[in-house]
From Swiss-Prot:
The lineage of its organism: Eukaryota, Viridiplantae, Streptophyta, Embryophyta, Tracheophyta. It comes from the Eukaryota. This is Peptide chain release factor APG3, chloroplastic. One of its GO terms (biological process) is thylakoid membrane organization. The gene is APG3. Residues 1-50 form a transit peptide. InterPro entries: PCRF (IPR005139), Pep_chain_release_fac_I (IPR000352), Pep_chain_release_fac_I_sf (IPR045853), Prokaryotic/Mito_RF (IPR050057), RF-1 (IPR004373). Disruption phenotype: Albino and pale green (apg) phenotype and early seedling growth arrest. Expressed in roots, leaves and stems. PROSITE patterns: RF_PROK_I (PS00745). Induction: By light. GO terms for cellular component: chloroplast. PANTHER family: LD18447P, PEPTIDE CHAIN RELEASE FACTOR APG3, CHLOROPLASTIC.
């Protein structure tokens, strides 16, 4: 037996057995694992003992592991250590690959143990007890390899560079008049509850209250750990079906609100030409006090190229409202840029991933049946707890769906590439 092979507990119990040469028939397990002949010829000793159904996965992981090793060598270089900026950059790059390398090495270890156990199963002969023990180990290793393969596929997927960012979340009343404004207020509270559950910092940026309750439009700032990665799936049209408080006949009305998720952008990413801005001040109708309607603290900002108008009143000073207005403008312009890029990618991939288009109806909140239906997931959730901020199950399901579709795209791309090269 190859002495360099990682030895399983069952294998160690049989090291005294004679390893006579024989050939194992090549066959695949449900996980896509296939066996090769044993012992390998001298020319094949350096090849993989177990192979995957997707060779691209192995090639990619081997490339990642090679990069990780190269980074490890560089980090030990005294010249790099003395340059803190370079050292931190390389250390960050290496840490981002740590999980991939750890899982891949465990995957290779399990592959070797699996082949070893298969060999021992042949050597066990008629020993039923030993055959049962080896069979149990083979099943265990096969299942672990399947799970590790799934992890590796997910780790292969490109990460969204915006996932770690804070966001500005805008909810805007759609069709439905006063009821749409009230529904907008309900959604604002839902996201506030979800932020509290997630230990995020939630604050109002700019809100236009409606006459009969709720908001015509409301913009919130949410800061915390990987906010965008969770809330990016909320972009789209949210439809509600319920009997409005003002409805005397008990008829169910349908109203909508549109949610936009805008990752925070800095001044370097979005350059705003002062000549494109019209800025005026106005009197604020704040929460009360001597300054109401006496001091012009509100800011009315108009961006001429895009037609975006922002009215900020939430802060107590004109300077802070101006800063908020420009912050929101940058986020809106950046969100437009990101959305256009994502749309271009979706068109190129011919993908139907429903994770952002504003015109898309993503959910229906049905009060009569106390049910929330996510149309992308084709899943239902309990209305009361959902509106109280219990969004995590839906968020995780959206993330899983996106991963699944990205993996399908990756497999199709690899298949097309293989067909072309073949």
């Amino acid at each position: 037996m190859n002495s360099s092979m990682t030895t399983s507990p069952t294998a160690r119990a049989f090291l005294h057995l004679h390893s006579s040469p024989f050939t194992l028939r090549s066959r695949k397990s449900p996980s896509g694992v296939c066996l090769v002949s044993w012992p390998p010829s001298r020319s094949r000793r350096t090849r993989r003992l177990v192979c995957m159904a997707e060779p691209y996965l192995i090639r990619k992981m081997e490339s990642v592991e090679k990069t990780w090793k190269e980074l490890s060598v560089k980090l030990a270089d005294p010249d790099v250590v003395s340059n803190q900026s370079e050292y931190q950059k390389l250390a960050q790059s290496m840490s981002e690959l740590d999980e991939v390398v750890t899982v891949f090495r465990r995957f290779k270890d399990c592959e070797k143990q699996l082949l070893e156990s298969k060999v021992l199963a042949k050597e066990a002969g008629d020993d039923e007890d030993m055959a049962e023990m080896i069979g149990s180990e083979i099943n265990s290793l096969t299942k672990e390899i399947e799970e590790l393969e799934k992890q590796l596929k997910v780790l292969l997927l490109p990460s969204d560079p915006l996932d770690a960012r804070n966001i500005l979340l805008e909810v805007r009343a759609g069709t439905g008049g006063d009821e749409a404004a009230i529904w907008t207020g309900d959604l604002v509270r839902m996201y506030q509850r979800y932020s509290e559950r997630s230990s995020w910092k939630f604050s109002m940026v700019s809100c236009s209250e409606a006459e009969h309750g709720g908001y015509k439009t409301c913009v919130m700032e949410i800061k915390g750990n990987r906010v965008y990665s969770k809330l990016k799936y909320e972009s789209g049209v949210h439809r509600v079906q319920r009997v409005p408080q003002t409805e005397t006949q008990g008829r169910v009305h349908t109203s909508t609100a549109t949610v936009a998720i805008m990752p925070e952008a800095d001044e370097v990413e979005v350059v705003i030409d002062p000549k494109d801005i019209e800025l005026t001040s106005a009197r604020s109708g704040g929460a009360g006090g001597q300054n109401v309607n006496k001091v012009e603290t509100a800011i009315d900002l108009f961006h001429k190229p895009s037609g975006i108008r922002i009215f900020c009143t939430e802060e107590r000073t004109q300077i802070r409202n101006k800063a908020r207005a420009f912050q929101l403008l940058r986020a809106k312009l950046y969100e437009i840029k990101v959305r256009e890029q994502q749309e271009k990618i979706r068109n190129e991939r011919k993908s139907q991933v429903g994770t952002g288009a504003r015109s898309e109806k993503i959910r229906t909140y049905n009060y009569k049946d106390s049910r929330v239906t996510d149309h992308r997931l084709k899943m239902n959730f309990a209305l009361t707890t959902f509106l109280d901020g219990a969004l995590e199950d839906a968020v995780q399901a959206c993330a899983a769906l996106e991963q699944k579709e990205l993996m399908e795209e990756l497999s199709e791309s690899v298949a097309a590439s293989s067909a072309t090269s073949g």
